[in-house]
């Protein structure tokens, strides 16, 4: 009888272990736009223990606004941005609890953008936050907190195979290798190329008094108290921080300030002193003001690094051989940052000159018309590039041009739906262009993935041969004299950050 019981226990234990592993494979790796939560969380666990001077927690505002790498570059301070999409305050608390098992930061920054939100996050967002965590008592408590607030079940978190069983037909090599060599080095941060300026009406309302009398929710305040207690227990100072966001108001600021005053917590609101770090709503945001792009990120990061240097006196570890991986990763970051320049150019003439650099392969595809609004100086640049006269003088027609290393290697135009498909270097390019009466479209695929903005005018997709990825996708509406730019956001979360 005893042997049967032991055999039964062993069977179910083995079954659970196998099912858990299969379940892990079935968990979606999530798209880059969702924030790569698995890669970034696994990277946290891969860090050498007790090497972080500071930790940054919160939702997407935290990891898009601050990168530990420019902080390291300028100050030799180590930090990690440990957050995930739409993270609620109760989940952030358990992230802090998890972090203190592996790191001993002296300061903990909590990004307050979603701290006051009482409504639970959606199912997908909760999964992105909880699935990547190692199984532990902390994770179990976090799951119980979330399932207690939603219709999600405990079993579906403990055995994700129950939730994702339909993914069998979708599995790829990445599902079996996630968490191995992820090629990610951003220390928790993500960078976005490209600028989408904030709207004028939103700028007018930014940090204004809406007349609301806001009070921080009592149920969320309980988690603030738990965070304070947790940080004190682990010898860390808790600091509230609010990174730039165009929808933040004076009333929201006052709500957090009142809470900070009540708890005796330092509160840094970047929305109250934009001139001190040079915030520019034209160039520093990737999505019209909700999140920072790489330009805004560097400004916010540098200010935070200076703050830590001034108030905490952290040792500059840039010459310390124990931190060689930081040096190597910071060099990679700097290279990518410098190459981001193209994604912030708003002028057509400057853009046409930029894409002629040796490192780029660029594809031009016209939708509807790209001729009627061309200025004379732009026409001269196009002629010097070797662009067909028909693009310059042919209204409502289609055009496809391939530029590699500054040279036109192929082009076609005409009053018909145009299609071009060839391999250029190591990438496969498929392009389609249709004038007003011939499809009215512009499509560019790089290795099968669509990148074109598909807007009226001249659509340009730029591939960087050194970084081995698309770094920008824009359209200039040259069908009228304004030449207005539209940019399709490129989130470079994949292999770089």
PLM regions with names:
Residues 86-90, 215-218, 244-252, 371:
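Acidic-and-aromatic substrate-binding clefts and catalytic sites of carbohydrate-active enzymes
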Residues 254-323:
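C-terminal regions of proteins
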Residues 338-361, 365-497:
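Short acidic-hydrophobic catalytic motif
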Residues 225-249:
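Active-site segments of SGNH/GDSL-like serine hydrolases
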Residues 57, 61-143:
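Membrane-embedded segments
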Residues 12-78, 88-98:
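Membrane/wall-proximal cationic-aromatic binding patches
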Residues 1-14:
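N-terminal Sec-pathway targeting helices
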Residues 126-234, 317-337:
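Secreted/periplasmic serine-hydrolase-like ester/acetyl group-modifying domain
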